[in-house]
Amino acid sequence: MDTLLFVLKSIVLGIVEGVTEFLPISSTGHLIIFENIMGFKSASPNYVKMYTYVIQLGAIMAVVLLYWKKIKETVINFFPGKVGYEKSGFKFWFMIFIACIPGAAVKLLLDAPVEKYLMTPVSVAIVLILGGLWMIYAEKKFRNNNLGKQKLSVTPKQALIIGAFQCLAIIPGMSRSASTIIGGWVAGLSTVVAAEFSFFLAIPVMFGYSLLEIIRIGGLTSLPAAELISLVVGFIVAFIVAVAVISQFISYLKRKPLKSFAIYRMIFAVIVLIAGFMGFF
């Protein structure tokens, strides 16, 4: 593939990742669809998969940048001292650890079958629709009950509930953000607190998993120059776009419902299904 075209495609996918990673519309699902649309392929084994993990790291670094003050405080005050939602840095990260457990277990058990059977544009579109309907139902049933509950503390039970809901994100098209926010609603948290806890939860989950997968695949050293350039470009683009999106998303959540994202999911999914039936995928 021509180097310039390869880099241009990586820019588009970096934008897609940066926009969708923290919105409740499924970044993995969008990447699967756009990779198929653009024919994003490579002669190098596992390159496309590695590219996905690298741009996810770019998106997660946006969280680190935007929440660096809170992260630094929770690390420095690992023992007593009121930080973020918790009264101690230790408790805060312990809640994150608890929330990670269900997802890690499910990932180990179901990663292979999910990758084998659910990584197609049509299956993603179906899940986008089902997830959108679920979001509308969950918001109507749970969100309004928690509008005034701006809790500054996440309990072990709440963390475990959020972690359990995060397990659904293993299904391409479901969305980790949507799953954890709905889990936060069910646990009794406000939308903003649930979303910010979701951002912090993404740091160990996505950062750790992406790094492990990059190492497992074989690292970056054996890739041709064009592919290395595209990785760097995709990482930077995803980082910059995610920084802008996260700030706007939190501001949006304070004023408006998630229903608009649910409607977008369903409209986009219908377009994908029509394209699939017409033979574009």
From Swiss-Prot:
Entry's Gene Ontology molecular function annotations: undecaprenyl-diphosphatase activity
Q: How does it sit in the membrane?
A: Multi-pass membrane protein
Which reaction(s) are listed as its catalytic activity? di-trans,octa-cis-undecaprenyl diphosphate + H2O = di-trans,octa-cis-undecaprenyl phosphate + phosphate + H(+)
Which parts of the chain span the membrane according to its record?
5-25, 48-68, 92-112, 118-138, 154-174, 192-212, 226-246, 261-281
User: Residue span of the signal peptide, if any?
Assistant: none
Q: Does the keyword Acetylation apply?
A: no
Q: Which terms in the GO cellular component ontology are assigned?
A: plasma membrane
Pfam families cross-referenced by the UniProt entry = BacA (PF02673)
The protein's job, in short, is: Catalyzes the dephosphorylation of undecaprenyl diphosphate (UPP). Confers resistance to bacitracin.
Question: What protein am I looking at?
Answer: Undecaprenyl-diphosphatase
- The protein's organism comes out as Ruminiclostridium cellulolyticum (strain ATCC 35319 / DSM 5812 / JCM 6584 / H10) (Clostridium cellulolyticum)
